[in-house]
Protein backbone atom coordinates (compact mmCIF):
# COMPACT_ATOMS: atom_id res chain seq x y z
CA UNK A 1 0.00 0.00 0.00
CA UNK A 2 1.42 3.36 -1.02
CA UNK A 3 1.67 6.39 1.21
CA UNK A 4 -0.91 8.15 -0.94
CA UNK A 5 -3.36 5.26 -0.54
CA UNK A 6 -2.88 5.25 3.24
CA UNK A 7 -3.55 8.98 3.26
CA UNK A 8 -6.81 8.51 1.37
CA UNK A 9 -7.97 5.74 3.71
CA UNK A 10 -7.19 7.93 6.70
CA UNK A 11 -9.55 10.60 5.38
CA UNK A 12 -12.55 8.29 5.67
CA UNK A 13 -14.55 9.29 8.76
CA UNK A 14 -15.71 6.97 11.53
CA UNK A 15 -19.44 6.33 11.61
CA UNK A 16 -19.73 7.43 15.25
CA UNK A 17 -18.18 10.79 14.40
CA UNK A 18 -20.55 11.29 11.47
CA UNK A 19 -23.59 10.46 13.60
CA UNK A 20 -22.63 13.09 16.17
CA UNK A 21 -22.72 15.75 13.47
CA UNK A 22 -25.85 17.93 13.68
CA UNK A 23 -26.60 17.39 10.00
CA UNK A 24 -27.31 13.72 10.71
CA UNK A 25 -29.87 14.35 13.46
CA UNK A 26 -32.73 15.05 11.07
CA UNK A 27 -31.70 12.15 8.85
CA UNK A 28 -31.89 9.78 11.82
CA UNK A 29 -35.28 11.19 12.79
CA UNK A 30 -36.63 10.78 9.26
CA UNK A 31 -35.16 7.45 8.21
CA UNK A 32 -34.24 5.80 11.51
CA UNK A 33 -30.87 5.19 13.16
CA UNK A 34 -30.57 1.63 11.85
CA UNK A 35 -31.05 2.51 8.18
CA UNK A 36 -28.69 5.49 8.32
CA UNK A 37 -25.95 3.35 9.89
CA UNK A 38 -26.49 0.59 7.30
CA UNK A 39 -26.10 3.09 4.48
CA UNK A 40 -23.00 4.69 6.00
CA UNK A 41 -21.34 1.28 6.23
CA UNK A 42 -22.23 0.62 2.60
CA UNK A 43 -20.83 3.99 1.54
CA UNK A 44 -17.59 3.39 3.45
CA UNK A 45 -17.19 0.10 1.60
CA UNK A 46 -17.82 1.90 -1.70
CA UNK A 47 -15.27 4.58 -0.83
CA UNK A 48 -12.61 1.98 0.04
CA UNK A 49 -13.26 0.24 -3.28
CA UNK A 50 -12.86 3.52 -5.19
CA UNK A 51 -9.60 4.24 -3.36
CA UNK A 52 -8.33 0.77 -4.15
CA UNK A 53 -9.27 0.92 -7.83
CA UNK A 54 -8.73 4.60 -8.68
CA UNK A 55 -6.47 6.05 -6.00
CA UNK A 56 -9.00 8.79 -5.30
CA UNK A 57 -11.94 9.62 -3.05
CA UNK A 58 -15.53 9.66 -4.33
CA UNK A 59 -16.77 13.20 -4.93
CA UNK A 60 -19.50 12.80 -2.31
CA UNK A 61 -16.92 12.36 0.47
CA UNK A 62 -16.94 16.15 0.73
CA UNK A 63 -20.48 16.05 2.13
CA UNK A 64 -21.56 12.73 3.61
CA UNK A 65 -24.87 14.03 4.98
CA UNK A 66 -25.93 15.41 1.62
CA UNK A 67 -25.16 12.11 -0.13
CA UNK A 68 -26.98 10.09 2.54
CA UNK A 69 -29.99 12.39 2.24
CA UNK A 70 -30.02 12.08 -1.57
CA UNK A 71 -29.79 8.29 -1.49
CA UNK A 72 -32.42 7.82 1.19
CA UNK A 73 -34.77 10.27 -0.49
CA UNK A 74 -34.53 8.30 -3.72
CA UNK A 75 -34.91 5.03 -1.83
CA UNK A 76 -38.07 6.30 -0.15
CA UNK A 77 -39.76 7.18 -3.43
CA UNK A 78 -42.72 5.01 -4.30
CA UNK A 79 -42.23 2.48 -7.08
CA UNK A 80 -45.49 3.80 -8.53
CA UNK A 81 -44.63 7.45 -9.10
CA UNK A 82 -47.02 10.00 -10.59
CA UNK A 83 -45.86 11.17 -14.01
CA UNK A 84 -47.06 13.66 -16.61
CA UNK A 85 -48.06 11.60 -19.64
CA UNK A 86 -47.30 13.55 -22.81
CA UNK A 87 -46.58 10.52 -24.98
CA UNK A 88 -49.67 11.02 -27.10
CA UNK A 89 -51.17 7.71 -25.91
CA UNK A 90 -54.19 8.31 -23.68
CA UNK A 91 -54.62 4.78 -22.31
CA UNK A 92 -50.92 4.02 -21.93
CA UNK A 93 -50.52 0.49 -20.58
CA UNK A 94 -47.07 1.18 -19.13
CA UNK A 95 -48.38 4.30 -17.38
CA UNK A 96 -51.41 2.66 -15.79
CA UNK A 97 -54.11 3.06 -18.44
CA UNK A 98 -57.27 4.91 -17.37
CA UNK A 99 -57.14 7.79 -14.92
CA UNK A 100 -59.83 7.32 -12.30
CA UNK A 101 -62.78 9.63 -11.85
CA UNK A 102 -62.88 11.62 -8.61
CA UNK A 103 -65.91 9.62 -7.54
CA UNK A 104 -63.91 6.40 -7.94
CA UNK A 105 -60.96 7.79 -5.97
CA UNK A 106 -63.25 8.84 -3.12
CA UNK A 107 -64.97 5.45 -3.12
CA UNK A 108 -61.64 3.63 -2.85
CA UNK A 109 -60.52 5.84 0.03
CA UNK A 110 -63.71 5.07 1.95
CA UNK A 111 -63.34 1.34 1.29
CA UNK A 112 -59.73 1.41 2.51
CA UNK A 113 -60.46 3.33 5.69
CA UNK A 114 -63.43 1.36 6.94
CA UNK A 115 -64.99 -2.09 7.01
CA UNK A 116 -67.49 -2.35 4.17
CA UNK A 117 -70.39 -4.59 3.19
CA UNK A 118 -68.26 -6.56 0.73
CA UNK A 119 -69.96 -9.90 1.38
CA UNK A 120 -72.46 -8.91 4.08
CA UNK A 121 -76.20 -8.54 3.60
CA UNK A 122 -77.59 -5.77 5.82
CA UNK A 123 -81.18 -6.96 5.30
CA UNK A 124 -80.82 -10.35 6.98
CA UNK A 125 -77.31 -10.15 8.51
CA UNK A 126 -76.30 -13.07 6.33
CA UNK A 127 -73.48 -13.56 3.90
CA UNK A 128 -73.86 -11.66 0.65
CA UNK A 129 -72.07 -11.90 -2.70
CA UNK A 130 -69.33 -9.43 -3.56
CA UNK A 131 -70.48 -9.07 -7.18
CA UNK A 132 -74.15 -8.43 -6.39
CA UNK A 133 -74.31 -4.62 -6.31
CA UNK A 134 -72.17 -4.26 -9.41
CA UNK A 135 -74.10 -6.98 -11.22
CA UNK A 136 -77.29 -4.98 -10.75
CA UNK A 137 -75.63 -1.87 -12.17
CA UNK A 138 -74.15 -3.74 -15.11
CA UNK A 139 -77.48 -5.37 -15.90
CA UNK A 140 -79.16 -1.97 -15.84
CA UNK A 141 -76.57 -0.51 -18.22
CA UNK A 142 -76.14 -3.44 -20.61
CA UNK A 143 -79.48 -5.23 -20.46
CA UNK A 144 -77.82 -8.48 -19.39
CA UNK A 145 -79.45 -10.97 -17.02
CA UNK A 146 -76.45 -11.19 -14.69
CA UNK A 147 -72.79 -10.24 -14.37
CA UNK A 148 -69.49 -11.43 -12.91
CA UNK A 149 -66.38 -9.40 -12.03
CA UNK A 150 -62.78 -10.63 -11.91
CA UNK A 151 -59.41 -8.89 -11.81
CA UNK A 152 -58.81 -8.30 -15.56
CA UNK A 153 -60.18 -9.25 -18.96
CA UNK A 154 -57.58 -11.99 -19.47
CA UNK A 155 -58.93 -13.59 -16.30
CA UNK A 156 -62.47 -13.07 -17.57
CA UNK A 157 -61.71 -14.96 -20.79
CA UNK A 158 -59.95 -17.73 -18.87
CA UNK A 159 -62.87 -18.15 -16.46
CA UNK A 160 -65.46 -17.94 -19.22
CA UNK A 161 -63.79 -20.76 -21.16
CA UNK A 162 -62.86 -22.94 -18.18
CA UNK A 163 -66.36 -22.83 -16.71
CA UNK A 164 -68.28 -23.47 -19.93
CA UNK A 165 -66.01 -25.40 -22.31
CA UNK A 166 -63.32 -27.33 -20.43
CA UNK A 167 -62.67 -30.65 -22.16
CA UNK A 168 -64.57 -29.55 -25.25
CA UNK A 169 -64.05 -27.59 -28.47
CA UNK A 170 -64.41 -23.86 -29.00
CA UNK A 171 -64.87 -22.66 -32.57
CA UNK A 172 -63.08 -19.39 -33.44
CA UNK A 173 -62.27 -17.64 -36.71
CA UNK A 174 -58.60 -17.81 -37.67
CA UNK A 175 -58.63 -14.04 -38.20
CA UNK A 176 -59.60 -13.49 -34.54
CA UNK A 177 -56.83 -15.44 -32.79
CA UNK A 178 -55.41 -12.31 -31.25
CA UNK A 179 -52.28 -11.67 -29.25
CA UNK A 180 -52.21 -8.72 -26.89
CA UNK A 181 -49.30 -7.26 -24.92
CA UNK A 182 -47.16 -9.61 -22.89
CA UNK A 183 -47.63 -12.48 -25.38
CA UNK A 184 -51.19 -13.17 -24.15
CA UNK A 185 -52.67 -15.29 -26.93
CA UNK A 186 -56.19 -16.66 -27.28
CA UNK A 187 -54.93 -20.18 -28.20
CA UNK A 188 -52.76 -20.24 -25.07
CA UNK A 189 -55.67 -19.17 -22.87
CA UNK A 190 -57.79 -21.93 -24.34
CA UNK A 191 -55.16 -24.52 -23.49
CA UNK A 192 -54.97 -23.24 -19.92
CA UNK A 193 -58.76 -23.43 -19.70
CA UNK A 194 -58.72 -27.05 -20.86
CA UNK A 195 -60.42 -26.30 -24.18
CA UNK A 196 -59.57 -27.46 -27.67
CA UNK A 197 -59.31 -24.68 -30.25
CA UNK A 198 -61.14 -25.39 -33.49
CA UNK A 199 -60.16 -22.58 -35.84
CA UNK A 200 -62.17 -21.94 -38.97
CA UNK A 201 -61.97 -19.79 -42.06
CA UNK A 202 -58.88 -17.94 -43.22
CA UNK A 203 -57.01 -14.95 -41.88
CA UNK A 204 -59.04 -12.48 -43.92
CA UNK A 205 -62.32 -14.29 -44.66
CA UNK A 206 -64.62 -16.42 -42.51
CA UNK A 207 -68.17 -17.39 -43.51
CA UNK A 208 -71.13 -18.71 -41.54
CA UNK A 209 -70.73 -22.06 -43.26
CA UNK A 210 -67.20 -22.34 -41.84
CA UNK A 211 -68.68 -22.32 -38.34
CA UNK A 212 -71.48 -24.68 -39.34
CA UNK A 213 -69.09 -27.28 -40.72
CA UNK A 214 -66.91 -27.11 -37.60
CA UNK A 215 -69.67 -27.89 -35.10
CA UNK A 216 -69.77 -31.46 -33.81
CA UNK A 217 -70.94 -33.37 -30.73
CA UNK A 218 -67.94 -32.06 -28.75
CA UNK A 219 -68.48 -28.36 -29.55
CA UNK A 220 -69.15 -26.26 -26.44
CA UNK A 221 -69.03 -22.70 -27.78
CA UNK A 222 -68.93 -20.50 -30.84
CA UNK A 223 -66.60 -17.65 -29.94
CA UNK A 224 -66.05 -14.17 -31.35
CA UNK A 225 -62.97 -12.16 -30.40
CA UNK A 226 -63.01 -8.44 -31.11
CA UNK A 227 -59.75 -7.57 -32.86
CA UNK A 228 -59.33 -4.37 -30.89
CA UNK A 229 -55.56 -4.04 -31.35
CA UNK A 230 -55.29 -4.61 -35.11
CA UNK A 231 -57.36 -4.30 -38.26
CA UNK A 232 -57.59 -6.49 -41.35
CA UNK A 233 -58.62 -4.45 -44.39
CA UNK A 234 -59.22 -5.13 -48.06
CA UNK A 235 -60.70 -8.43 -49.26
CA UNK A 236 -62.31 -9.46 -45.97
CA UNK A 237 -65.38 -11.21 -44.65
CA UNK A 238 -66.58 -11.82 -41.10
CA UNK A 239 -69.98 -12.62 -39.69
CA UNK A 240 -71.35 -10.52 -36.88
CA UNK A 241 -72.67 -11.70 -33.54
CA UNK A 242 -76.33 -11.57 -34.57
CA UNK A 243 -75.71 -13.93 -37.48
CA UNK A 244 -73.57 -16.20 -35.33
CA UNK A 245 -76.23 -16.28 -32.59
CA UNK A 246 -78.84 -17.34 -35.14
CA UNK A 247 -76.54 -20.15 -36.25
CA UNK A 248 -75.85 -21.08 -32.64
CA UNK A 249 -79.56 -21.36 -31.88
CA UNK A 250 -80.03 -23.58 -34.91
CA UNK A 251 -77.17 -25.84 -33.78
CA UNK A 252 -77.88 -25.49 -30.03
CA UNK A 253 -74.43 -24.01 -29.31
CA UNK A 254 -74.06 -20.81 -27.22
CA UNK A 255 -72.08 -17.82 -28.51
CA UNK A 256 -69.59 -15.92 -26.35
CA UNK A 257 -67.57 -12.79 -27.18
CA UNK A 258 -64.30 -11.41 -25.88
CA UNK A 259 -64.90 -7.73 -26.53
CA UNK A 260 -61.58 -6.50 -25.12
CA UNK A 261 -61.79 -2.73 -24.71
CA UNK A 262 -65.48 -2.57 -23.96
CA UNK A 263 -67.05 0.86 -24.38
CA UNK A 264 -70.38 1.33 -22.63
CA UNK A 265 -71.36 4.36 -24.72
CA UNK A 266 -71.47 5.04 -28.44
CA UNK A 267 -68.22 6.93 -28.94
CA UNK A 268 -69.36 8.30 -32.29
CA UNK A 269 -71.63 10.80 -30.50
CA UNK A 270 -68.42 12.45 -29.25
CA UNK A 271 -66.80 12.49 -32.68
CA UNK A 272 -64.73 9.37 -31.96
CA UNK A 273 -64.70 6.11 -33.94
CA UNK A 274 -67.47 3.74 -32.89
CA UNK A 275 -66.58 0.60 -30.93
CA UNK A 276 -68.94 -2.36 -30.43
CA UNK A 277 -70.74 -2.13 -27.09
CA UNK A 278 -71.66 -4.97 -24.70
CA UNK A 279 -75.32 -3.93 -24.71
CA UNK A 280 -75.48 -4.36 -28.49
CA UNK A 281 -74.13 -7.90 -28.25
CA UNK A 282 -76.45 -8.78 -25.37
CA UNK A 283 -79.39 -7.51 -27.44
CA UNK A 284 -78.17 -9.71 -30.31
CA UNK A 285 -78.43 -12.75 -28.04
CA UNK A 286 -74.80 -13.43 -27.17
CA UNK A 287 -74.68 -15.64 -24.06
CA UNK A 288 -71.55 -14.13 -22.46
CA UNK A 289 -69.60 -10.95 -23.21
CA UNK A 290 -66.30 -10.10 -21.52
CA UNK A 291 -64.54 -6.72 -21.50
CA UNK A 292 -62.03 -4.60 -19.59
CA UNK A 293 -62.70 -2.09 -16.84
CA UNK A 294 -59.62 0.08 -17.35
CA UNK A 295 -59.69 0.81 -21.07
CA UNK A 296 -62.50 2.67 -22.82
CA UNK A 297 -64.79 2.14 -19.84
CA UNK A 298 -62.44 4.42 -17.87
CA UNK A 299 -62.42 2.56 -14.56
CA UNK A 300 -60.02 0.36 -12.57
CA UNK A 301 -58.36 -2.78 -13.89
CA UNK A 302 -61.08 -5.40 -13.91
CA UNK A 303 -62.56 -8.10 -16.09
CA UNK A 304 -66.31 -7.86 -16.56
CA UNK A 305 -68.54 -10.62 -17.89
CA UNK A 306 -72.20 -9.98 -18.61
CA UNK A 307 -74.75 -12.38 -20.03
CA UNK A 308 -77.34 -15.03 -19.36
CA UNK A 309 -78.06 -15.91 -15.74
CA UNK A 310 -77.52 -19.65 -16.13
CA UNK A 311 -74.12 -19.11 -17.80
CA UNK A 312 -73.00 -16.54 -15.22
CA UNK A 313 -74.00 -18.97 -12.44
CA UNK A 314 -71.58 -21.52 -13.87
CA UNK A 315 -68.80 -18.93 -13.75
CA UNK A 316 -69.61 -17.91 -10.19
CA UNK A 317 -69.49 -21.50 -8.96
CA UNK A 318 -66.22 -22.40 -10.71
CA UNK A 319 -63.13 -22.75 -8.43
CA UNK A 320 -61.21 -20.27 -10.59
CA UNK A 321 -63.65 -17.50 -9.67
CA UNK A 322 -62.30 -17.29 -6.13
CA UNK A 323 -58.73 -17.18 -7.40
CA UNK A 324 -59.57 -14.43 -9.88
CA UNK A 325 -62.08 -12.37 -7.90
CA UNK A 326 -61.69 -8.61 -7.52
CA UNK A 327 -60.89 -6.99 -4.17
CA UNK A 328 -62.92 -4.34 -2.36
CA UNK A 329 -60.88 -1.41 -3.74
CA UNK A 330 -61.42 -2.53 -7.32
CA UNK A 331 -65.11 -3.10 -6.73
CA UNK A 332 -65.50 0.28 -5.03
CA UNK A 333 -63.82 2.11 -7.92
CA UNK A 334 -65.74 0.15 -10.53
CA UNK A 335 -69.10 0.77 -8.87
CA UNK A 336 -68.44 4.51 -8.67
CA UNK A 337 -67.36 4.56 -12.32
CA UNK A 338 -70.40 2.62 -13.49
CA UNK A 339 -72.71 4.99 -11.62
CA UNK A 340 -71.37 7.82 -13.80
CA UNK A 341 -72.84 6.02 -16.80
CA UNK A 342 -76.31 6.42 -15.31
CA UNK A 343 -75.99 10.15 -16.10
CA UNK A 344 -74.57 10.17 -19.65
CA UNK A 345 -75.08 13.91 -20.12
CA UNK A 346 -72.22 14.59 -17.66
CA UNK A 347 -70.02 11.64 -18.62
CA UNK A 348 -67.54 13.51 -20.85
CA UNK A 349 -66.87 15.93 -18.00
CA UNK A 350 -66.64 13.53 -15.06
CA UNK A 351 -64.91 10.54 -16.69
CA UNK A 352 -61.22 11.45 -17.29
CA UNK A 353 -60.72 8.95 -20.12
CA UNK A 354 -63.60 10.35 -22.14
CA UNK A 355 -62.67 13.92 -21.24
CA UNK A 356 -59.13 13.46 -22.60
CA UNK A 357 -60.23 11.57 -25.69
CA UNK A 358 -62.73 14.28 -26.62
CA UNK A 359 -60.45 17.31 -26.20
CA UNK A 360 -60.50 19.21 -29.48
CA UNK A 361 -57.34 19.87 -31.48
CA UNK A 362 -58.17 23.59 -31.38
CA UNK A 363 -58.19 23.68 -27.57
CA UNK A 364 -54.93 21.75 -27.40
CA UNK A 365 -53.36 24.05 -30.01
CA UNK A 366 -54.24 27.13 -27.94
CA UNK A 367 -52.77 25.46 -24.85
CA UNK A 368 -49.54 24.68 -26.72
CA UNK A 369 -49.22 28.27 -27.91
CA UNK A 370 -49.74 29.50 -24.35
CA UNK A 371 -46.96 27.26 -23.00
CA UNK A 372 -44.49 27.76 -25.84
CA UNK A 373 -43.18 31.17 -24.74
CA UNK A 374 -41.96 30.31 -21.21
CA UNK A 375 -40.44 27.04 -22.41
CA UNK A 376 -38.68 28.72 -25.32
CA UNK A 377 -37.24 31.30 -22.94
CA UNK A 378 -35.93 28.56 -20.66
CA UNK A 379 -34.64 26.07 -23.25
CA UNK A 380 -34.01 28.36 -26.22
CA UNK A 381 -30.22 28.41 -25.89
CA UNK A 382 -30.03 24.70 -26.73
CA UNK A 383 -33.32 23.86 -28.42
CA UNK A 384 -35.82 25.31 -30.84
CA UNK A 385 -39.18 25.05 -29.07
CA UNK A 386 -42.09 24.93 -31.52
CA UNK A 387 -45.80 24.15 -31.63
CA UNK A 388 -46.50 21.33 -34.08
CA UNK A 389 -49.64 19.42 -35.12
CA UNK A 390 -49.59 15.73 -34.22
CA UNK A 391 -51.82 12.68 -33.89
CA UNK A 392 -52.66 11.08 -30.54
CA UNK A 393 -53.65 7.46 -30.18
CA UNK A 394 -56.13 5.87 -27.80
CA UNK A 395 -53.85 3.05 -26.62
CA UNK A 396 -54.20 -0.25 -24.75
CA UNK A 397 -55.17 -2.01 -27.97
CA UNK A 398 -58.25 0.17 -28.47
CA UNK A 399 -59.09 1.44 -31.98
CA UNK A 400 -55.60 0.66 -33.31
CA UNK A 401 -55.81 2.42 -36.69
CA UNK A 402 -57.60 5.55 -35.49
CA UNK A 403 -55.74 8.73 -34.56
CA UNK A 404 -56.90 11.90 -32.82
CA UNK A 405 -55.72 15.31 -34.13
CA UNK A 406 -53.70 17.04 -31.42
CA UNK A 407 -50.89 19.54 -30.87
CA UNK A 408 -47.43 19.14 -29.38
CA UNK A 409 -44.54 21.19 -28.10
CA UNK A 410 -41.40 19.97 -29.87
CA UNK A 411 -37.78 20.43 -28.86
CA UNK A 412 -35.16 20.33 -31.63
CA UNK A 413 -31.45 20.68 -30.71
CA UNK A 414 -29.77 23.56 -32.51
CA UNK A 415 -26.75 21.38 -33.25
CA UNK A 416 -28.91 18.52 -34.54
CA UNK A 417 -27.37 15.97 -32.18
CA UNK A 418 -29.74 13.21 -31.14
CA UNK A 419 -27.76 12.63 -27.96
CA UNK A 420 -29.00 16.01 -26.71
CA UNK A 421 -32.59 14.81 -27.09
CA UNK A 422 -31.81 11.63 -25.16
CA UNK A 423 -30.14 13.70 -22.45
CA UNK A 424 -33.11 16.08 -22.20
CA UNK A 425 -35.60 13.21 -22.01
CA UNK A 426 -33.48 11.56 -19.30
CA UNK A 427 -33.39 14.82 -17.29
CA UNK A 428 -37.16 15.07 -17.44
CA UNK A 429 -37.51 11.47 -16.24
CA UNK A 430 -35.50 12.41 -13.13
CA UNK A 431 -37.82 15.27 -12.13
CA UNK A 432 -39.86 14.97 -8.90
CA UNK A 433 -42.84 14.43 -11.20
CA UNK A 434 -41.30 12.93 -14.36
CA UNK A 435 -42.43 14.33 -17.70
CA UNK A 436 -42.70 11.58 -20.31
CA UNK A 437 -42.67 12.46 -24.01
CA UNK A 438 -41.38 10.65 -27.09
CA UNK A 439 -38.46 11.13 -29.46
CA UNK A 440 -39.33 11.00 -33.14
CA UNK A 441 -37.94 12.47 -36.35
CA UNK A 442 -35.14 14.41 -34.67
CA UNK A 443 -37.41 16.07 -32.10
CA UNK A 444 -38.64 15.46 -28.57
CA UNK A 445 -42.43 15.64 -28.74
CA UNK A 446 -44.73 16.57 -25.87
CA UNK A 447 -48.27 15.82 -27.03
CA UNK A 448 -50.49 17.96 -24.82
CA UNK A 449 -53.72 15.97 -25.17
CA UNK A 450 -53.41 14.59 -21.63
CA UNK A 451 -52.10 17.78 -20.00
CA UNK A 452 -54.64 19.28 -17.62
CA UNK A 453 -52.41 20.62 -14.82
CA UNK A 454 -50.38 23.31 -16.58
CA UNK A 455 -49.00 24.77 -13.36
CA UNK A 456 -47.40 21.53 -12.25
CA UNK A 457 -46.08 20.97 -15.79
CA UNK A 458 -44.34 24.36 -15.82
CA UNK A 459 -43.02 23.89 -12.28
CA UNK A 460 -41.29 20.71 -13.43
CA UNK A 461 -39.90 21.88 -16.77
CA UNK A 462 -38.76 25.31 -15.59
CA UNK A 463 -36.74 23.93 -12.65
Curated annotation (Swiss-Prot):
It is found in: Cytoplasm. One of its GO terms (molecular function) is L-seryl-tRNA(Sec) selenium transferase activity. The modification N6-(pyridoxal phosphate)lysine is found at residue 295. Keywords: Cytoplasm, Protein biosynthesis, Pyridoxal phosphate, Selenium, Transferase. It catalyses: L-seryl-tRNA(Sec) + selenophosphate + H(+) = L-selenocysteinyl-tRNA(Sec) + phosphate. It comes from the Bacteria. GO terms for biological process: conversion of seryl-tRNAsec to selenocys-tRNAsec; selenocysteine incorporation. Pathway: Aminoacyl-tRNA biosynthesis; selenocysteinyl-tRNA(Sec) biosynthesis; selenocysteinyl-tRNA(Sec) from L-seryl-tRNA(Sec) (bacterial route): step 1/1. Its EC number is 2.9.1.1. Its cofactor is pyridoxal 5'-phosphate. One of its GO terms (cellular component) is cytoplasm. InterPro entries: PyrdxlP-dep_Trfase, PyrdxlP-dep_Trfase_major, SelA-like, SelA_trans, SelA_trans_N_dom. Converts seryl-tRNA(Sec) to selenocysteinyl-tRNA(Sec) required for selenoprotein biosynthesis. Belongs to the SelA family. HAMAP family: SelA. Homodecamer; pentamer of dimers. Binds only one seryl-tRNA(Sec) per dimer. This is L-seryl-tRNA(Sec) selenium transferase.
